[in-house]
């Protein structure tokens, strides 16, 4: 076993990768410990259960991704460009994951969220919903600004953001099911169509 000081971080990293490349339900504590190089006793020193570890791991991953999304959706960036950058980021990120793991992984929040939504222990589902709501708000702000600037037709940005987020969720899920990055290439085309944007530029990815 490595140093106890980094065992918690290695457990979270192992959990994130295992549930992303596989599934939450199929991932066992033994598998997590093996991948992290941590003994089971150390697992229970840091976490009382697999659920607690998963909540911590997804929260940690979100905090690592958040600065990049903050930059993409900065109010200093024109609203339609924010949406384009978001679509481009999603494609590039999935391409990097495919290069590393050999397949398109999609978004773990969507796949794990669907998997645990009927579980009696709601902690993981609640954490996923919390993170997804943060992501949706990025879209809502960009949509509101685009409408205010006369660039889009979205008088109800909250509703429009939920529709657009569901569209992205569908694309990510289909890309994983089909193991096909091309599903994500025209995300901006559908985005502009849903928002009533008149001009759609070719995808940059």
Model-based region annotation:
Residues 98-123:
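Amphipathic alpha-helical segments used for helix-helix packing
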Residues 10, 18-60:
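Helix-turn-helix
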Residues 81, 85, 118-147, 186-189:
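Amphipathic alpha-helical packing segments from all-alpha helical-bundle domains
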Residues 93-97, 118-120, 145, 164-182, ...:
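Amphipathic C-terminal alpha-helical segment
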Residues 105-111, 155-174, 190-193:
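Hydrophobic alpha-helical segments that form the core
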Residues 1-6, 201-205:
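N-terminal intrinsically disordered/low-complexity leader segments
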Residues 56, 70-105, 158-164, 205:
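Hydrophobic alpha-helical connector segments
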Residues 80-81, 104, 126-130, 148-163, ...:
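All-alpha amphipathic helical-bundle segments outside canonical DNA-binding/catalytic cores
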């Amino acid at each position: 076993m490595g140093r106890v000081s980094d065992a918690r971080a290695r457990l979270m990293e192992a959990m994130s990768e295992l549930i992303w490349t596989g599934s939450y339900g199929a991932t066992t504590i033994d598998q997590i410990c093996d991948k992290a190089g941590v003994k089971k006793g150390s697992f229970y020193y840091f976490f009382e259960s697999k659920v607690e570890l998963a909540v911590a791991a997804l929260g940690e991953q979100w905090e690592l991704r958040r600065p990049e999304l903050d930059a993409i959706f900065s109010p200093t960036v024109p609203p339609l460009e924010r949406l384009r950058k978001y679509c481009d980021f999603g494609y590039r990120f999935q391409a990097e994951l495919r290069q590393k793991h050999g397949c398109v992984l999609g978004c773990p929040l969507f796949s794990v969220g669907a998997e645990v939504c009927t579980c009696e222990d709601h902690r993981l589902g609640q954490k996923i919903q919390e993170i997804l709501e943060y992501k949706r708000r990025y879209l809502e702000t960009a949509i509101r600004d685009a409408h205010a600037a006369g660039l889009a037709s979205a008088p109800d940005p909250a509703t429009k953001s939920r529709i657009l987020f569901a569209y992205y969720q569908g694309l990510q899920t289909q890309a994983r099911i089909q193991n096909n990055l091309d599903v994500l290439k025209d995300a901006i085309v559908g985005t502009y169509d849903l928002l009533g944007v008149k001009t759609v530029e070719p995808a940059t990815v």
